[in-house]
A protein has these predicted regions:
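Junction motif at the cytosolic side of a transmembrane helix
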Residues: 143-151, 219-241
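Hydrophobic transmembrane alpha-helix segments characteristic of membrane transport
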Residues: 39-46
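A cytosolic-side transmembrane-helix exit/cap motif
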Residues: 176-184
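Short helix-to-coil transition segments within interhelical loops
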Residues: 48-55
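Transmembrane alpha-helices of multi-pass eukaryotic membrane proteins
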Residues: 158, 216-217
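Secretory targeting signals
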Residues: 1-39, 59-153, 170-171, 188-213
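Central hydrophobic cores of alpha-helical transmembrane segments
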Residues: 154-168, 185-187
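Alpha-helical transmembrane segments and their immediate interhelical loop/hinge regions
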Residues: 44, 57-59
Length: 241
C-alpha cells in the first residue's frame, strides 16, 4: 500500500486517530461526571455528603468512572481499528519501518516520509499510539474529577471543559518564536491533538526532540493534579447548606 496512493499512515493515525481521541475524551468526561454528579441529580447529596465517610465515596466514584471510561475507550479503539484493519489488512507490513519510503505521503506540497526519532515499525507505532490514547483518557478523567470538585455541577463542568479544550487547541496554533513556545507546547494538551498522527517524530522547532509527547503528558498531568488536590481539599471542608 504505497502512501502516495492509499495514505495508510495519515488515515490510520491522523484522520481516524484525531476523531477517536476526541470521542475518547468526551466519553471519559461523561462517564466520570455521571457518577460523581449522581447524588446531586438524585437529590440525595444532603444525606451522603453530610459525613466524612460519605464524602470519601466521591473519590471512589471518580476512580470507577475513570476505569469505566478506559474500558469504553479500549472497546471503541478495538472496534474502530479492527474495522479499519478488516477492510485494509496489513498482513506482511507490520514489521515495515514507519520511516520507509513506501509509507511516505504528500505533505506540505512534497512527498515527505514519516521519520521517527526511534526505529519503530508499523506495529510498534500502533501500540505506542494506543498507549498515548489511554494515557490521555486517564488525564481527561482526572480533569473531569477536578472540575466537579471545584464546581460541583456536571453540566457546568462539561461546558467549562469543552470551552477550555477548544481554547487550548486554538492557543496551540499561536507561536511567539521564543522559548515560551516550548513551554506552552509541553503544557498544552491541544498540541497532542493537533499533532496526532505525527507523534514520536519531528513536527516543528518547538517539538524537535525525542519524547516530547511524554513530556507533554507529564506537564499536563502536573497542571491537572494541582486543581484536583485543591478542589478535593476544599470539598472535604464543604458544608451543605
Amino acid at each position: 500500500y504505497p502512501g502516495i496512493v492509499y495514505f495508510v499512515h495519515g488515515t490510520l493515525f491522523g484522520k481516524l486517530g484525531k476523531k477517536l481521541l476526541l470521542e475518547i475524551v468526551v466519553l471519559v468526561f461523561l462517564t466520570v461526571l455521571y457518577l460523581m454528579d449522581y447524588e446531586r441529580v438524585q437529590k440525595t447529596a444532603d444525606q451522603v455528603f453530610v459525613t466524612r465517610c460519605g464524602k470519601s465515596t466521591l473519590h471512589l466514584k471518580m476512580i470507577g468512572g475513570i476505569l469505566g471510561g478506559l474500558i469504553y475507550s479500549a472497546l471503541l479503539l478495538l472496534a474502530s481499528y479492527g474495522w479499519f484493519l478488516a477492510k485494509l489488512p496489513l498482513k506482511g507490513l507490520w514489521k515495515v519501518p514507519v520511516s520507509a519510503s513506501m509509507m511516505a505521503e504528500p505533505r506540505f506540497g512534497m512527498l515527505n516520509p514519516f521519520v521517527t526519532f526511534w526505529n519503530v515499525n508499523l506495529r510498534s507505532y500502533l501500540l505506542l499510539t494506543l498507549v498515548m490514547f489511554l494515557a490521555i483518557a486517564l488525564l481527561a478523567g482526572i480533569l473531569a474529577g477536578a472540575g466537579w470538585y471545584c464546581l460541583k455541577n456536571s453540566y457546568l463542568v462539561f461546558l467549562v471543559l469543552s470551552v477550555l479544550l477548544m481554547g487550548l487547541v486554538q492557543a496551540a496554533l499561536v507561536h511567539t518564536t521564543t522559548f515560551l513556545d516550548i513551554v506552552l507546547s509541553i503544557c498544552n494538551p491541544g498540541v497532542l491533538w493537533i499533532t496526532c498522527g505525527a507523534w514520536f517524530m519531528e513536527n516543528d522547532l518547538t517539538l524537535s526532540f525525542a519524547g516530547s509527547e511524554f513530556c507533554s503528558l507529564f506537564g499536563c498531568g502536573i497542571l491537572i493534579l494541582l486543581p484536583y488536590f485543591i478542589g478535593k481539599k476544599r470539598f472535604r471542608k464543604w458544608e451543605l447548606m
